[in-house]
């Protein structure tokens, strides 16, 4: 089977409370790789991106969640929607394609512990 390649936007979320995030576009992403393989790639790539400020490059990202899929409705949340975790949080043992990721999908990359704290008390600092 030929590798399916896609363009994905990964939103690096440093802080939910302060709405501190930065999108990074990746071209030619293989949708048949597992979520775990993509996380490993991101953890290796993000620290090397000199265009990102150090607080975003050197953070403990570990979780991916689908923010928006092309040609579908967007959430009103400014940083990340807190609903539908069962379907939108990507499981490491599945492929990106099996998880619902397609070309032009926007994915959030963040620290799972930060997300749990924010979900329990979703207050913004500004």
Swiss-Prot record:
Pfam families: DUF2340. InterPro entries: UPF0538 (IPR018794). Belongs to the UPF0538 family. This is UPF0538 protein C2orf76 homolog. It comes from Mus musculus. The lineage of its organism: Eukaryota, Metazoa, Chordata, Craniata, Vertebrata.
């Amino acid at each position: 089977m030929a590798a399916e390649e896609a363009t994905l936007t990964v939103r690096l979320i440093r802080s939910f409370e302060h709405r501190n995030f930065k999108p990074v576009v990746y071209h030619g992403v293989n949708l048949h790789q597992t979520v775990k393989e993509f996380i490993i790639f991101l953890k290796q790539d993000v620290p090397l991106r000199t265009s990102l400020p150090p607080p975003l490059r050197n953070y403990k990202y570990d979780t991916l969640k689908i923010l928006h899929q092309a040609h579908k409705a967007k959430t009103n949340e400014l940083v990340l929607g807190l609903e539908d975790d069962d379907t939108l949080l990507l499981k490491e043992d599945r492929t990106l394609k099996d998880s619902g990721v397609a070309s032009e999908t926007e994915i959030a990359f963040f620290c799972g512990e930060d997300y749990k704290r924010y979900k329990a008390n979703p207050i913004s600092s500004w």
